[in-house]
Amino acid sequence: MSFLSIVRDVRDTVGSFSRRSFDVRVSNGTTHQRSKSHGVEAHIEDLIVIKNTRWANLPAALLRDVMKKLDESESTWPARKQVVACAGVCKTWRLMCKDIVKSPEFSGKLTFPVSLKQPGPRDGIIQCYIKRDKSNMTYHLYLSLSPAILVESGKFLLSAKRSRRATYTEYVISMDADNISRSSSTYIGKLKSNFLGTKFIVYDTAPAYNSSQILSPPNRSRSFNSKKVSPKVPSGSYNIAQVTYELNLLGTRGPRRMNCIMHSIPSLALEPGGTVPSQPEFLQRSLDESFRSIGSSKIVNHSGDFTRPKEEEGKVRPLVLKTKPPRWLQPLRCWCLNFKGRVTVASVKNFQLMSAATVQPGSGSDGGALATRPSLSPQQPEQSNHDKIILHFGKVGKDMFTMDYRYPLSAFQAFAISLSTFDTKLACE
């Protein structure tokens, strides 16, 4: 009996338990008291069955070897869902998966929902694409499963919906493709702009590593041991990044210039041996919550206006990212950036982000729109983290854009930054 058939057997068994629990919950609407007690008994019975099943009692050494082989063999989606299915069998299997399956920073793979808020790979990039729906003002982020840019088959990751207000624009970001709202249990953050569309704040529902620097809920204690999204403190809006587009006061045509201050990432993260501190609450419950039904919670906004979070002297400086200045090609009369074939359509939205410590002011005359024609240059020697492109975004077709990111950005952060380029900018171009 192959291991994949075993996984399917276990998954079907767990699925039957879930369906039984669902049937019990549905019956609650008619006979509340009786159904409630019956539902508890059925739930306990299911837990006992799972706990006593032969799958939960496999020897640890055997289970570890099997999980390792599965993690190595099922390395891409959709086959990767077998690893997720194993983590949902029981607590023993879940803990084993948590120990074996590495974060994207070291594996380069997106496996569990928590991976969307973990830094990308250090030695590679994660290739994604964004599909825009102008009629519904929605944006969907997918993991690229094929090298072909225009192939519209991918693993869904995140979605966003734009809402225009009188003085600002807001993008709500969710892990659900259809239910995109702040009241949903899949809501994980938002992007908010000012009136001109030149400044954006990225808000996360979980505090960053330096949450003491970020405006926190007043007169409330914070506990991280509950099984809910937020035990005593409702999920809030924590300022983790600020995106600013430089004003174009002269009115000349040219590429946009963007600055990103990543409050949740220290500048030392790009130094040798540097790391991105994790969110204690979020990562502590992440894998368990991936397999539980998360109830919606009240939203508390303690984000403030477009001002920098309060910082004390001696605190770690945040990472600052800037757009890489393109080269002006006089024969083509266009701006040029090397996207290595990942961007094919010239657009003012196209950009590449790298550490501000290495960005030098570009030179050249004013000209047309930003082109994406790759420049032919000899292979460069190995780059340091400061010299590498951390995020690049560009157009490949009608309402289709590629988004590739790497360490230290996460998929959530890269998606939020990319969303800012879709907004109308009255004074930047």
Swiss-Prot record:
Protein species of origin: Arabidopsis thaliana
GO terms (BP aspect): regulation of DNA-templated transcription; response to fungus
Record domain F-box: where: 53-108
InterPro entries per record: Tubby-like_C (IPR025659), Tubby_C (IPR000007), Tubby_C_CS (IPR018066)
Family listed: Belongs to the TUB family.
Organism placement in taxonomy: Eukaryota, Viridiplantae, Streptophyta, Embryophyta, Tracheophyta
Expression sites (tissue/organ): Mostly expressed in roots, flowers and siliques.
Domain of life: Eukaryota
Protein name according to UniProt: Tubby-like F-box protein 5
Polar residues composition-biased segments: 374-383
